[in-house]
Amino acid sequence: MASLVAGIDEVGRGCIAGPVIAAAVIFAPGQDTHGLADSKRLRPDRRLVLAGRICSESLAWAVGRAEVSEIDQLNILRATHLAMCRAVAALPVLPDWVRVDGNRYPPLDCPGEAIVGGDASVAEIAAASILAKVFRDREMEVLDRLCPGYALGVHKGYPTRLHIDRLASRGASFFHRRSFAPVRAVIDRSSAS
């Protein structure tokens, strides 16, 4: 088995606002990874503690992103793979093997595998899911302060009832993904008026 294994995961794929963020994490062989879990199963305060530990104790970590304009231009799958490739390219050490959460392997220059449910079963992927979630949530909270009225700090860009209601009453903003159906519907309604 390869000695340096990177885990990759993304956050924001199902959102209708904001970027998609991917993280890549490499642990030193034999490193203690106790307590890591899929970011969706952790309380926000626990995610923050673990993210700090991952950043300080992992052999290497990096974050990549795809902007709203890239998501709208490429489609969400290709934009997600772009964010993943950017995360791996930003690593200060290149991995020998990559494990990606999901069912499709991105076009990386290193070998690896896609693992469905990897965020719950592979420590490196769980760590990447935690970093990606913490980084994206922080960005959405900053965006909420810069553009109040959409409650981005609450729903983080996901298509919740609150977000859809705010989108309908306020219209789409620069951070909304125009290629996504709920946003497109609001734009179409406002242009028909």
Swiss-Prot record:
Top-level EC class as recorded in UniProt: hydrolase
Catalytic activity: Endonucleolytic cleavage to 5'-phosphomonoester
Cofactor requirements of the protein: Mn(2+); Mg(2+)
Keyword terms, alphabetized: Cytoplasm, Endonuclease, Hydrolase, Manganese, Metal-binding, Nuclease
E.C. number: 3.1.26.4
Compartment annotation: Cytoplasm
Pfam families with a match to the protein in the record: RNase_HII
Top-rank taxon, per record: Bacteria
GO cellular component: cytoplasm; ribonuclease H2 complex
Sites where the protein binds a divalent metal cation: D9, E10, D101
Family annotation (InterPro entries): RNase_HII, RNase_HII/HIII, RNase_HII/HIII_dom, RNaseH-like_sf, RNaseH_sf
Coiled coil stretches, renumbered: none
GO term, biological process aspect, one: mismatch repair
SUPFAM superfamilies: Ribonuclease H-like (SSF53098)
GO molecular function, one term: RNA-DNA hybrid ribonuclease activity
Domain RNase H type-2: residue ranges: 3-192
Cofactor note: Manganese or magnesium. Binds 1 divalent metal ion per monomer in the absence of substrate. May bind a second metal ion after substrate binding.
Record-linked PANTHER family: RIBONUCLEASE H2 SUBUNIT A, RIBONUCLEASE HII
Family, as annotated: Belongs to the RNase HII family.
Its biological purpose: Endonuclease that specifically degrades the RNA of RNA-DNA hybrids.
Name recorded for this polypeptide: Ribonuclease HII
Organism the protein comes from: Methylococcus capsulatus (strain ATCC 33009 / NCIMB 11132 / Bath)
Lineage: Bacteria, Pseudomonadati, Pseudomonadota, Gammaproteobacteria, Methylococcales
The encoding gene: rnhB
